[in-house]
A protein has these predicted regions:
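Acidic, glycine/polar-enriched metal-coordinating patches/loops
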Residues: 37, 51-140
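Intrinsic low-complexity, repeat-rich intrinsically disordered segments enriched
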Residues: 1-45
Length: 140
């Protein structure tokens, strides 16, 4: 497995002695769905996009780092029909059993429903555990 860090500048002189990145970008990975299941392989990156053509009943993440914090941001676009849904009660992480993603106030996840609507859904993992999910809806 090879990793590549692309930055224009890395500076160690920051006010909190952390590393400052300039010119940072993330690599998109392919996000696919089949028979209502979204498959996300985080080996190659932490962002991806999908246009929904069916209701999603299961989201399967693979290669989520077992230690530390990691995230995945998914651009979700409704197809020309719209009204597609994404369930978060059957999420698997690295081949484990189904878990229900955690959302603010236990409100669940409701996507925008209009044809061609665009939402951003973020998944945050601590030690490859149950994802914390947040969304930004209805970009237009």
């Amino acid at each position: 497995m090879s990793s590549e860090l692309k930055v224009d500048t890395i500076s160690e002189k920051t006010s909190n002695n952390g590393v400052e990145l300039k010119g940072y970008k993330e690599t998109d990975v392919a996000v696919t769905s089949s028979s209502g299941v979204i498959a996300v392989d985080m080996t190659g990156g932490n962002t991806g996009a999908i246009t929904l053509s069916e209701n999603i009943t299961d989201i399967d993440f693979t290669n989520v780092p077992a230690n530390g914090t990691s995230s995945f941001t998914m651009k979700v676009t409704q197809d020309g029909t719209g009204s597609r849904t994404m369930a978060i009660n059957a999420i698997t992480v690295n081949g484990g059993g189904n878990v229900t993603g955690l959302t603010p106030g236990a409100a669940g996840l409701t996507l925008s429903t209009g044809a061609n609507d665009v939402d951003l859904v973020s998944f945050l993992f601590f030690d490859a555990g149950t994802p914390l999910i947040n969304s930004l809806l209805d970009f237009s």
